[in-house]
Amino acid sequence: MRVISGKARGIVLRTPNGMETRPTADRVKEALFSIIQFELPCARVLDLFAGTGQLGIEAISRGASFAQFVDAREDACRLIRENLKRTAFENQANVVRCDYANYLAKCKDKFNIILLDPPYIEVFLENALKMITEIDILQSGGIIVTERPLEKELSFDFPGFTRSKDYKYGKTVLTLFRKD
């Protein structure tokens, strides 16, 4: 796994042993960042369910000013810090060890982009989306990007948000939502 483009292009990121973390495939990551490229300059990014930190790190590499990484697992947070050090992005990032629900319940920060790539086997995605739409952490015009397996439908009907489009890449679907 590597940083695809930007200031840290080509830097190899560490990945965990085992299958507990499922990093986004390079092809999907490339597509995601092509879709949101014009949203990135100077953006504040929340990488929820951060895992290795690869999505937030890619965002910083491509021009985001700051990324907040949130993961419930200590080993994941340690890995994110190591990957931030490899890319020299430590000063543009913060790593928080916390489960997503507690983090969102207490969050006072505002973001331009929220990246949601939770474990596929859980119900985290819809719960996190619901919480995000009920609290005020996304700037007006900001976007939420979700990653999910093709076989998992995503129902979304929250006032103040528009579902823009689904992008399919093999067995993976990216969905974008914009705050009105």
Ranges and model annotations:
Residues 1-180:
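Class I S-adenosyl-L-methionine-dependent methyltransferase catalytic core
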